[in-house]
């Protein structure tokens, strides 16, 4: 067979591929599908925006995030990380008081990456809307390869501290040599980039692991038909939720 195109992984795809493969290798997945009738939900969204009580437009995505945050407060075991050592047969589950959501975001170039939306459980609808808008603003000032390389190096150091020396060496060889070398900023270009205040660009804190994953597929594929029924859980998280596109279809309504 003749190869028609060959694309080497950039750092973003390397990180996603690494986390996804680790997910399927280490986590037994199960899925549950709930398909609500959302006509009244959408009516509430319209009523909130027509009320004049909010200085900004409240989106379906914002209210969905707020609703899920309240659900995690009611079921804190889902907002957790798990650790398990198979060799020593030791493990623990750590529940968190704050809800940090790893959420897929569409970038200006059309690519997607996962960002960490911090502490959404303690934000009201206006604060959450303004926070999401600010994240979008900071993306425009961010060199994503640079910030993701920072996250990758931080994760590599953590693995080194855990004694995973061979894995660390393999990762360094893969990212620093040959055709697969990760390209980062150099010289004056790097100096100019890091002169941008951290509150005006994304940092490692905005990319690192959250406590739970939510992927709003409906905002990415608005004309989607069918649904996603299994989303990979990113370790050490224990929960991943996929929100599908709103679809018109006949349903049975129980009065």
Please report, for each region that a protein language model flagged, where it lies by residue.
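C-terminal catalytic/motor cores of large multi-domain enzyme assemblies
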Residues: 1-255
């Amino acid at each position: 067979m003749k190869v028609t195109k060959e694309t080497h992984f950039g750092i973003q795809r390397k990180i996603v591929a690494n986390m996804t493969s680790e997910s399927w290798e280490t986590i037994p997945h199960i899925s549950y599908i709930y398909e609500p009738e959302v006509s009244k939900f959408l009516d509430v969204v319209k009523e909130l925006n027509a009320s004049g009580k909010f200085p900004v437009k409240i989106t379906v995505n914002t209210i969905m995030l707020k609703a899920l945050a309240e659900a995690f407060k009611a079921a804190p075991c889902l907002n957790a990380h798990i650790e398990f050592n198979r060799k020593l047969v030791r493990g623990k589950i750590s529940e968190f008081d704050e809800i940090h959501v790893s959420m897929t975001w569409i970038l200006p170039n059309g690519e997607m990456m996962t960002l960490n939306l911090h502490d959404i459980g303690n934000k009201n609808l206006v604060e959450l809307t303004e926070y999401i808008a600010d994240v979008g603003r900071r993306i425009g000032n961010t060199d994503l390869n640079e910030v993701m390389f920072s996250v990758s190096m931080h994760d590599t150091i953590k693995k080194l501290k855990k004694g995973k020396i061979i894995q660390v060496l393999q990762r360094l060889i893969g990212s620093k040599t040959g055709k697969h070398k990760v390209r980062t900023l150099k010289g004056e270009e790097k100096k100019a980039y890091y002169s941008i205040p951290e509150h005006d660009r994304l940092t490692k804190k905005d990319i690192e692991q959250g406590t739970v994953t939510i992927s709003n597929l409906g905002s990415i594929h608005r004309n989607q038909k069918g649904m996603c029924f299994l989303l990979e859980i990113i370790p050490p998280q224990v929960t991943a939720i996929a929100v599908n596109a709103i679809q018109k279809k006949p349903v049975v309504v129980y009065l």
